[in-house]
Amino acid sequence: MAPPKFSITPEKEASRSQWIHRQLIAKTPPVAKDVNLSGQTAIVTGSNTGLGLETARQLLYLGLSKLILAVRSEEKGKAAREELLADKEAGSGEIEVWNLDLESYDSVIQFADRAKALDRLDIAILNAGLFQAKETFIASTGYERCVQVNYLSSVLLMTLLLGALKSKNETRPGRLVLVSSDTAAWANFKEQKSRPILATFKNKADKWDMQERYGVSKLLGQFYLTELAKRVPASVVTIDAANPSFCYGTALTRDGDGTIAGLLLNGFRRVVGKPTAVGALSIVHAAVSFGEEVHGQYAEDGEIRPMAPIIYKPEAEEIGKQLWDETLAELSFARLEESIQELTS
């Protein structure tokens, strides 16, 4: 697709020099003072620590009435809940802890079914993800773990949550945010030439590159979000991606703790990384700022910015359609196409 009018080109946005500028110099403005989430309900996945926890905290600061912490470990989720309840600035919003395991399709479906039973759902932020130091596979699906969690299970959840997000309040549609990454723009994505595409992620890599695979998993999400936004009107659910930037104080790279690569990465993070509170603010902007103009777009530092350059290349249309068809076929048990059609009927 042709890029909308941005303040920066996709290629410049993806450059390392611009990344350093964003990390060390750029500022994220505060959320507008008139934003009030009183009466609203939000889900934040991966919210027991790091960016997810800080995002949840900031939503409560904005007056959110009900927060659902979606976590793999209920014990850690309950500890996060207690931390938020003890925060005097977080108000008196209700906080629930729900189990969600993105390595299991059954868990995703059960979570989505539970969400559909809510009286209302205004915001869903899909923040949970992982960064794998070693290549491993999910036995039940055969897919490499990073692609399974960051892409397949995440887009299954985002699509299943659309029905719950379909607003009962005509003044503002529900908002669905997929947390993305700068690394999507840096991915070589050699798998784009394969047909089918997804099946390549069931094969062992010739040489494991954890940043490349993480970036590819986030790029796949950008392709899917772009296709999904074409099929779901912004007036029904507004869908966007958020880039929190490279932050310290997160558990994303915990899989590499104790390794030389992990030590180097954590040291680098302390030099150029942003505090999690700043990264979370970008996510919150994607959830509460903007209007329908953010639909199908990518928000960073309180602005709408370009996604990975490939998203705007001529070949993106064919790649996006191929990936969409393969993804819906892989997730056919969930009847996602029918769910999408029901939203607009």
Curated annotation (Swiss-Prot):
It holds the Pfam family adh_short. The active site is at residues 180, 214, 218. NADP(+) binds at residues 51, 76, 101, 127, 214, 218. It comes from the Eukaryota. Signal peptide: none annotated. GO terms for molecular function: oxidoreductase activity. The keyword Oxidoreductase applies. Pathway: Secondary metabolite biosynthesis. Its EC number is 1.1.1.-. The keyword NADP applies. Keywords: NADP, Oxidoreductase. Belongs to the short-chain dehydrogenases/reductases (SDR) family. Short chain dehydrogenase; part of the gene cluster that mediates the biosynthesis of virensols and trichoxide, fungal natural products that contain or are derived from a salicylaldehyde core. The pathway begins with the synthesis of the reduced chain in virensol C by the highly reducing polyketide synthase virA via condensation of one acetate and 8 malonate units. VirA has interesting programming rules since the first 2 ketides are fully reduced, the 3 following ketides undergo beta-dehydration, and the last 3 ketides are only reduced to beta-hydroxys to yield the trihydroxy portion. This is Short chain dehydrogenase virG.
